[in-house]
């Protein structure tokens, strides 16, 4: 065995020696490497211990292994052309030097596949776009995860025409060329040097489906609406030049003044709108409002990807305008002096409510159109803004414009498309409600007649119907307690009630009043009660016999409209008016003064004008004149009666002497029911009366009759007790601003010795206090033979729960 291994070692040495003479060749070092490897392998064999033979020894020295040849990163131009091995040494490689030829490295490399760093460059470019282009990440994410996989198929599909179109656009884009130049070591050129983008030369109509063809895909283009050539305006207000596309874009894009940006408190304004307007006028779609709001950046400016032509921006800004006036009036009530928040001229950051309203009006096309159903909603909300500012001319014109825009849009709908019909019908009903109330207040023709609308009601089963109502903090009222209750406001039921009462008044009551009918017949009161119904959510509260309490504002609004119609049907009966005043007073205490809908002032003014024409008692009219105008002046006025600030709400101080009190007491004795007027009721002064109700021609034939001595027991509220019923203590536990509830009115019976309940501190409407000498008033009340008036009406004691014919003398004797 040892001689045989020696022969192998000798052969290996001979081979290595023979290979050593080939070092002069270009591949000599490769052969040496192979020989060294063989020597190492044979050396390992010589060191193997053979079992039973003992360790083996070798008599030859093994050479160390040489390093493996490394591949050069780049060969020279000459070796590459001759297909020779090159060591890559610059400026001249060894093969070129040995052959005496020039060596150059000038040819540009042409690598196969993507260039080095291409994927990372695209990733960094996307990350930069996510940081600098607002909501671009959300748009791309929605494309990937939504639409039943259609968006992901667009990006990863191979045979999709839309994918081919997008890939062709990227391949010819300036960004792709710039990235290619950067990765190849060249400087990226200015895009202006390339001229027009090659992507603009692609015929997108023939290249396949667009991204926008997929459902809910975000719009990636910024297009301006068609400019209007009209030079006249049909709406009131300052005359402005025609609104062009550039003007519209400039209004929506951020500028130095901040107009055109969303107000910083836009989320709060939207909450105010949904809590205090959408709860009784559900004409907007919440999802559309949120979707439109997300098309603005965090700074409030409109994103370039937003669709400016959509009318949803007009209704969004109109809703913000309506809520901004309510928020500004609330802020002004807690500040001294004129409210700068309402006009905003000294605040360059927050736009004023008037500026927001102007922006909303600019987003609505002129009479030449084109119109969408959202423009009708925006016009109707701007009409409510004008009503709140006591600018009835603008309100009347705006609601007329909204009606005609709606009729135009309805004619453009496809005959076989019934999807938008329910919302269009609800919008038509909303226009009818507002139009009827505005026309009744100012005795002007209505744009819609009751016969123009088919019998409803609208379906009362939807998401809006069952959403819990949440108050907004800062508008006054008992928001802490109400937030814990989370009761539904039933917007759809409230909307149907408003429509039913308004249509009944317009269909049956107004014609009778214009034909000199003194009071509505019993059929009207019966139908009025049927409109509310006994199965509706608020039937118990609306038809209650006393001033009950509720926890949502829509219940108070329904009761207010119901009592207004009842009082309108019997202008000489003061019972409904007293209940109406108490309901509004409780509404104000629970939800705040500025949460009252703008329709309420029109209802009150029309009722006051009717009572003036029907020759009701002077004391009652004077009381209404002092109270009603306060509700129509809570917002900054506009139009011809424009004011510079909000009118503070104050209280009329009662006459401090007994003489002044005694002067009005004979009027109290004329009607027993009039004693329900609380002498400590909150009243207001310092506010001018609104424009008189011009209804002389319509009501000139109404004859004067005797005042009612008691409640008509056959009426719709036949079981009502005297209107002097006290408010429920639980319902008025807190007043706005933390003021305690108003004490109940004093009641004095001359036949008893019980001391009257009175207080020397009277809470005012501005939540202050004023000292009043009630001792003199109580003495005067005690000197009046009030029991005589009670004996005249036996039904009075029956309503209190006693047997007919019972008087307070009998009760006092029984107690003793």
From Swiss-Prot:
Gene3D superfamilies: Zn(2)-C6 fungal-type DNA-binding domain. Residues 184-202 have a biased composition (Polar residues). GO terms for biological process: DNA-templated transcription; positive regulation of transcription by RNA polymerase II; quinate metabolic process. Induction: Expression is induced in the presence of quinic acid. The expression of qa-lf appears to be autoregulated. Keywords: Activator, DNA-binding, Metal-binding, Nucleus, Quinate metabolism, Transcription, Transcription regulation, Zinc. The keyword Nucleus applies. It comes from the Eukaryota. This is Transcription factor qa-1f. It comes from Neurospora crassa (strain ATCC 24698 / 74-OR23-1A / CBS 708.71 / DSM 1257 / FGSC 987). The lineage of its organism: Eukaryota, Fungi, Dikarya, Ascomycota, Pezizomycotina. The gene is qa-1f.
